[in-house]
UniProtKB/Swiss-Prot annotation:
It is found in: Mitochondrion membrane. Pfam families: Oxidored_q5_N, Proton_antipo_M. It comes from the Eukaryota. The gene is MT-ND4. It catalyses: a ubiquinone + NADH + 5 H(+)(in) = a ubiquinol + NAD(+) + 4 H(+)(out). Coiled coil: none annotated. It is a multi-pass membrane protein. GO terms for cellular component: mitochondrial membrane. This is NADH-ubiquinone oxidoreductase chain 4. Keywords: Electron transport, Membrane, Mitochondrion, NAD, Respiratory chain, Translocase, Transmembrane, Transmembrane helix, Transport, Ubiquinone. Belongs to the complex I subunit 4 family. GO terms for molecular function: NADH dehydrogenase (ubiquinone) activity; ubiquinone binding. InterPro entries: NADH4_N, NADH_Q_OxRdtase_chainM/4, NADH_UbQ_OxRdtase, ND/Mrp_TM.
Length: 445
């Protein structure tokens, strides 16, 4: 684990001293090498400070795999920037990756909290410095306020747990039962921060703003990894805190399922492509929240599968939206129509990614949603109404997104250049792991 961490750390000075001509080739290939080395981390591993198990290893692997892809995706936009800013951008991306990986590796909740909150700063810089419109400052403010407001109770809860147990609380050990009132306050304090990060419907307003204003690398990292920190945190807290009573997690499950349905309905009325994909993330994370709250073996396996699947799928959708944006300079879906006759290969990628997003079998998205649906139905048969409605609307807006961007008459007031092999490679590296994991889901479940 330390080897991989040091390799990632050394990428920061590398980006700062490389020759301009070699900057992207070297950093991308170096980070691909780190991604391949990180495959060895799938085996459980533990020492005093760092700890990996079947919950954190797949998410850690996902974060390392997406790091070179964020560099590749932002290459076109970054080439227009001065060299020093390109170096700074790559360094901040690497720093963000370092904080994320240490969050997943941390063996005690204090270190996990510090790294969890440290991810805020690089993400904020990426959104507010490299975003496209002036609204990026508002998006950055929303992101910061939601994160900081909910993280204060989490810090208080962690300090209380540390004082009660007289240890930095290794994840293997469960806290002794205190009074019911204390338990309730601890759960609400811990869940607040992670639910805002997921985000649950109601605490989600920062997400569409951040996604729409962030550059492509920021959108990819936000959708694929930063949202998963919330799910990972909830799973970790269920291992430490005393077992939840049904009357506490019932409102959260209802809120997350109803929120998923409402987010899906919001998707149907979106005109902005990135905003639609962002609301789609809110609905998928609603299912993950519901699954983690039930705390059965099946539901946790389903939550893990859906988190990994959503990481690849949403990141791929943002890459495709960016490919369209680079050519049309607009995110409005009605202005980006008719791409099937201009870029037919990109239409194929759109179709495959949307099918993954709908969760058609035999994709890993389907495996995750099937496990979640089974555990929800077993827990309370009525939940199938909200779940089924959510699935139906997901299929509707995914097909609407595909048809409105790819079919129809092209707008003829723009010059469209052909796709680069870089963009095709980017899509292959998103979709290939999804297909391979679908063949062997026990790697992540």
């Amino acid at each position: 684990m330390l080897k991989i961490t040091f390799m990632t750390m050394m990428l920061i000075p590398t980006t700062l001293i490389l020759k301009p001509k070699m900057l992207y080739q070297t950093t991308t290939s170096y980070s691909f090498m780190i991604a391949l080395f990180s495959l060895s981390l799938l085996e459980p591993n533990s020492n005093t400070y760092l700890h990996l198990d079947s919950t954190s290893a797949p998410l850690l692997l996902l974060s390392y795999w997406l790091m070179p892809m964020t560099m590749m995706a932002s290459q076109h936009a970054m080439n227009k920037e001065p060299l020093q800013r390109q170096r700074t951008f790559l360094s901040i991306l690497t720093l963000l990756q370092l904080f994320i990986s240490l969050t997943f590796m941390a063996s005690n909740i204090t270190l996990m909290y510090i790294m969890f909150e440290a991810t805020l700063i690089p993400t904020l810089i990426i959104i507010t410095r490299w975003g496209q419109q002036t609204e990026r400052l508002t998006a950055g403010t929303y992101f910061m306020m939601y994160t900081l407001t909910t993280s204060m109770p989490l810090l208080t809860a962690i300090l209380f747990i540390n004082n009660t147990t007289n240890t930095p609380t290794l994840f293997m050990q469960m806290m002794q039962t205190t009074s019911p009132w204390t338990e309730l306050m601890l759960w609400i304090a811990c869940l607040g921060a992670f639910l805002a990060k997921m985000p649950v419907y109601g605490l989600h307003l920062w997400l569409p703003k951040a996604h729409v204003e962030a550059p492509i690398a920021g959108s990819m990292v936000l959708a694929a990894i930063l949202l998963k920190l919330g799910g990972y945190g909830i799973i970790r807290m269920t291992q430490i805190l005393p077992t939840m009573k049904t009357d506490l997690f019932l409102p959260f499950i209802v809120l997350s399922l109803w929120g998923a349905t409402l987010a899906n309905l919001t998707c149907l009325q979106q005109t902005d492509l990135k905003s639609l994909i962002a609301y789609s993330s809110v609905s998928h994370m609603g299912l993950v929240i519901a699954a983690t709250m039930i705390q059965t073996q099946w539901s946790l396996s389903g939550a893990m599968a859906l988190m990994i699947a959503h990481g690849f799928t949403s990141s791929a959708l943002f890459c495709l939206a960016n490919t369209t944006y680079e050519r049309t300079k607009t995110r409005i879906m009605i202005l980006t129509r008719g791409f099937h006759s201009i870029l037919p290969m990109i239409t194929t990628w759109w179709l495959m990614t949307n099918l993954m997003n709908i969760a058609t079998p035999p994709s890993i998205n389907f495996t995750g949603e099937l496990l979640i649906a089974s555990s929800l139905f077993n827990w309370c048969p009525t939940t199938i109404i909200l779940f089924g409605l959510s699935m139906l609307i997901t299929a509707s807006y995914s097909l609407h997104m595909l048809l409105s961007t790819q079919t129809g008459t092209p707008t003829l007031n723009m010059v469209t250049y052909p796709t680069h092999s870089r963009e095709h490679l980017l899509m292959v590296l998103h979709i290939l792991p999804l297909m391979l994991i679908s063949l062997k889901p026990e790697l992540i479940i």
